[in-house]
A protein has these predicted regions:
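Redox- and metal-dependent alpha/beta enzyme cores, enriched for Fe-S-associated oxidoreductases
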Residues: 177-209
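His/Asp/Glu-rich metal-coordinating catalytic cores
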Residues: 1-104, 110-119, 144
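Core dinuclear metal-dependent hydrolase active-site scaffold
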Residues: 9-56, 151-181, 219-226, 263-269
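Short, conserved loop/helix-junction motifs that constitute active-site signature segments
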Residues: 60-63, 115, 181-188, 228-232
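Binuclear metal-ion centers of metallo-dependent hydrolases, dominated by the metallo-beta-lactamase
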Residues: 80-147, 226-269
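Active-site regions of enzymes building and remodeling cell-envelope glycoconjugates
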Residues: 2-8, 18-21, 65-67, 138-151, ...
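Active-site metal-binding loops of divalent metal-dependent hydrolases
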Residues: 26-29, 47-49, 71-73, 100-102, ...
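His/Asp/Glu-enriched, well-ordered alpha-helical/loop segment
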Residues: 208-234
């Protein structure tokens, strides 16, 4: 009560204290957006972004002089196509993939369905997200996937713990259906993480108890270079990463790399 809440469009504009804010689909997840503020020579804030998704679209942003950009993977530069070949090989044995319902759950199911896989099970939260996406594109999805999502929804088998491939929340693999299945003594699927692993998951991976194969949901170096070209930015702030040697990040002529500490000092003055 008393909150002044206004939903914003995935792709659109709104006014914030006299500043025009433009939004666009970020390519990372359902409903995810980037922000562009029409101030000075433009300020771009990416949030989580990806340009490699087969499901989620990435809207080209307006030019911006200063860009605060998702660099979660650092200078990692392995393409999604290469990762898909690796991941596909891991999915030949019974596997449980702990996934976020609004992100790669539906995308992985869609890609596997395109290859004729019919032994895929989605838990209730993942299936509900598929229903929402198949019913209405809020601007997050590529325009040509709606019919495929509807077909996938019609043909997916009922959830079963015996399915060869199970896509289930939560992505940490400790809660939700994924956590419940892993605690069952009669469940023997191999757990395969495709995204961020917390400390426990990382320890389990080092011990050989679980598998890991990254599914790109953040920018590779190639994507960062493409984004800088789109934005024509003169200053880039790599976020969600540790910049050890700033010289390694000077990958775009005319674009100065700014660390978050340097930016903080800049703003204070």
């Amino acid at each position: 009560a008393g909150r002044n809440v206004h939903p914003i469009a995935v792709s659109g504009q709104f006014q914030l204290g006299g500043i025009t804010v433009t939004t666009g689909s970020c390519g990372h997840a359902w409903g995810g957006v980037w922000f562009h503020l029409d101030v000075a020579d433009g300020l771009f804030y990416s949030g989580d972004i990806s340009m490699e998704s087969a499901l989620f679209r990435f809207d080209v942003p307006p030019p911006a002089g200063l860009a605060l950009v998702d660099a979660s993977y650092g200078l990692y530069n392995v393409s999604q196509r290469q990762q898909w070949d690796k991941l596909r090989a891991r999915l030949t044995l019974p596997a449980l993939c702990p996934v976020p319902p609004s992100g790669r759950a539906v995308e992985l199911a869609l890609l596997l369905a395109r290859e004729g896989r019919t032994d895929i099970a989605l838990d209730a939260p993942c299936l509900e997200m598929l229903r929402q996406m198949a019913a209405h594109n809020d601007g997050s999805l590529h325009q040509d996937v709606e019919a495929e999502l509807q077909q996938l929804l019609r043909t997916l088998p009922a959830f079963s713990a015996q399915s060869s491939l199970i896509l289930a929340a939560d992505p940490d693999g400790q809660s939700g259906m994924a956590g419940e299945l892993r605690r069952r003594k009669d469940f023997h699927h191999r757990t395969l993480f495709t995204g961020h692993m917390n400390r426990l998951n990382h320890q389990q991976w080092l011990a050989g108890e679980v598998d890991f194969c990254r599914w790109n949901v953040h920018p590779t170096l190639k994507t960062l270079m493409l984004l800088v070209s789109m934005l024509k930015c003169s200053r880039l702030v790599p976020m969600f990463t540790h910049v050890e040697d700033i010289q390694d990040w000077q990958f775009a002529p005319g674009c100065h790399i700014v660390t978050q500490n340097m930016l903080r000092v800049d703003l204070c003055h």
